[in-house]
């Protein structure tokens, strides 16, 4: 009986020696193991993410600058208009670098024209200013839509490669190799979704900022047109 009991630990040790150590793969290893196709997809997504972040900061800086208002600007314009000093009003507009000053300058250039002409000139300049602020926003929207599709394309390519390896292996299917290929394929979808979400949020954030500036421009131009109407 003692001999039997002594043999039990030996069998336990032999079983524990058969336990396979769990293997883990880092994200970098998964990406780098995707082959040329997977690396191209992930490289493309990386470039798109950099481009999206660049547009976010560059456009935010431009829009923020356009939204800054000088409280004394319209007051000075009002004083010049009331004093019939049109040249001084033009000079002030030229020396002030913001959308509202350029729009009002267009109106002052047509100060002797009918109000409809003045309003049309201001509106046309306003459209140009909005176009400047919205520059590259369409590209950001494109990144938001294209990145997930590019990531999904990488997944499809990865799955095709994985199943091709299964077919080539015949009956000798390596489950570890197959699982690794599927993991790698799914990484491109995750990458595409991350880039797409970042670009989508950035796009809507910038659009909301542009809308706020447009509201400011409309309010200031209305004040200017009312001023001209009262001084006719």
Give the location of each predicted region.
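Juxtamembrane non-transmembrane "cap" segments at the membrane-aqueous interface
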Residues: 2-17, 157-170
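Residue-level signature of catalytic and energy-coupling elements of molecular machines
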Residues: 35, 53, 89, 104, ...
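Predominantly long cytosolic amphipathic alpha-helical stalk/bundle segments
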Residues: 61, 66-153, 157-171, 201-232
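Residue-level signal for the membrane-embedded core of alpha-helical transmembrane segments
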Residues: 41-51, 144-150, 154-157, 189, ...
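Alpha-helical membrane-interface segments at transmembrane helix boundaries
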Residues: 28-38, 123-144, 175-187
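Hydrophobic alpha-helical transmembrane segments of polytopic membrane proteins
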Residues: 183-202
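Hydrophobic membrane-targeting segments
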Residues: 8-72
């Amino acid at each position: 009986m003692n001999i039997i009991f002594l043999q039990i630990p030996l069998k336990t040790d032999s079983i524990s020696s058969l336990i396979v150590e769990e293997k883990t793969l880092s994200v970098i290893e998964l990406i780098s193991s995707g082959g040329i196709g997977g690396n191209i997809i992930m490289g493309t997504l990386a470039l798109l993410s950099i481009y999206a972040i660049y547009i976010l900061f560059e456009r935010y800086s431009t829009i923020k600058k356009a939204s800054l208002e000088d409280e004394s600007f319209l007051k000075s314009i009002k004083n010049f208009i009331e004093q019939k000093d049109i040249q001084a009003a033009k000079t002030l507009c030229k020396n002030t670098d913001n959308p509202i000053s350029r729009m009002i300058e267009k109106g002052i250039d047509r100060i002797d024209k009918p109000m409809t002409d003045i309003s049309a000139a201001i509106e046309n300049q306003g459209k140009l200013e909005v176009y400047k602020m919205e520059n590259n926003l369409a590209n950001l929207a494109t990144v938001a839509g294209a990145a997930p599709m590019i990531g999904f394309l990488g997944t499809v390519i990865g799955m095709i490669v994985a199943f091709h390896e299964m077919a080539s292996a015949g009956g000798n299917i390596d489950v570890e190799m197959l699982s690794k290929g599927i993991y790698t394929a799914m990484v491109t979808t995750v990458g595409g979704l991350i880039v797409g979400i970042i670009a989508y949020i950035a796009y809507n954030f910038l659009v909301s900022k542009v809308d706020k500036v447009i509201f400011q421009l409309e309010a200031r131009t209305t004040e200017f047109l009312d001023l001209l109407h009262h001084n006719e």
